[in-house]
C-alpha cells in the first residue's frame, strides 16, 4: 500500500520460514511509524553545519535552544537527529548509508564544498556505485547510487 513517501508491503511468502519473523508477533510485521538515526556529536554546531550546509540535508525540526540544541534532518524515508553533546566520537564502526540519484554529480558537489573523500566512487561487486566520506566526528558515510539495471530497482 502506498502512503506517499513510504511504501508499506505485506511480508513476503518466504517470511513464514524465517526464524526471526517470530519475534514480530502474530501480526507479521512491526508497525513502524517513523525512524531516525540518533547521533550525539562532540561539537553540535560543527556537525549541524556539516549536515545542513555541506551535505545539504533539509531540516525537519529543531528543539531546545543554544549551541547544544537538537536538530532533526530529513534523511530519505527516515530522519537523522543530532542531539546532546558527546565526550568522544561515536564508535568507529558507526556508518550512514545515503542513496543519491547520481553519484558523479554528488561527488562533484561535495568536492566543490571541500569534503574530503575517503574513497572515490567505485562499482562494487554487488553492483552498487559507492563512495565514502566522513562527518566531523569521523562517522563514515557511504553515498550510493543504485544503477538502473540493479535488482534493487526492479518492481516485479
Predicted segments with their positions:
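Extreme N-terminal basic, low-complexity initiation segments
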Residues: 1-11
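Ala/Thr-enriched low-complexity intrinsically disordered regions
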Residues: 10-13, 29
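N-terminal beta-strand motif that seeds the catalytic metal site of vicinal oxygen chelate
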Residues: 17-48, 94-96, 147-156
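Core segments of cupin and vicinal oxygen chelate
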Residues: 31, 38-80
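Vicinal oxygen chelate
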Residues: 33-42, 71-74, 87-113, 129-134, ...
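A short acidic/small-residue loop/turn micro-motif
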Residues: 88, 125, 146-150
Amino acid at each position: 500500500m502506498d502512503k506517499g513517501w513510504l511504501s508499506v508491503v505485506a511480508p513476503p511468502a518466504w517470511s513464514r520460514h524465517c526464524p526471526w519473523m517470530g519475534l514480530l508477533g502474530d501480526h507479521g510485521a512491526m508497525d513502524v511509524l517513523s525512524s531516525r538515526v540518533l547521533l550525539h556529536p562532540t561539537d553540535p554546531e560543527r556537525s549541524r553545519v556539516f549536515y545542513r550546509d555541506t551535505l545539504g540535508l533539509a531540516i525537519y525540526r529543531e528543539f531546545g535552544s543554544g549551541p547544544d540544541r537538537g536538530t532533526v534532518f530529513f534523511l530519505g524515508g527516515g530522519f537523522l537527529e543530532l542531539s546532546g553533546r558527546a565526550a568522544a566520537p561515536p564508535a568507529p564502526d558507526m556508518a550512514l548509508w545515503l542513496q543519491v540519484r547520481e553519484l558523479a554529480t554528488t561527488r562533484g558537489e561535495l568536492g566543490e564544498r571541500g569534503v574530503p573523500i575517503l574513497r572515490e566512487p567505485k562499482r562494487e561487486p554487488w553492483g552498487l556505485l559507492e563512495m565514502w566520506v566522513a562527518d566531523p566526528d569521523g562517522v563514515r558515510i557511504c553515498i550510493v547510487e543504485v544503477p538502473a539495471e540493479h535488482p534493487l530497482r526492479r518492481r516485479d
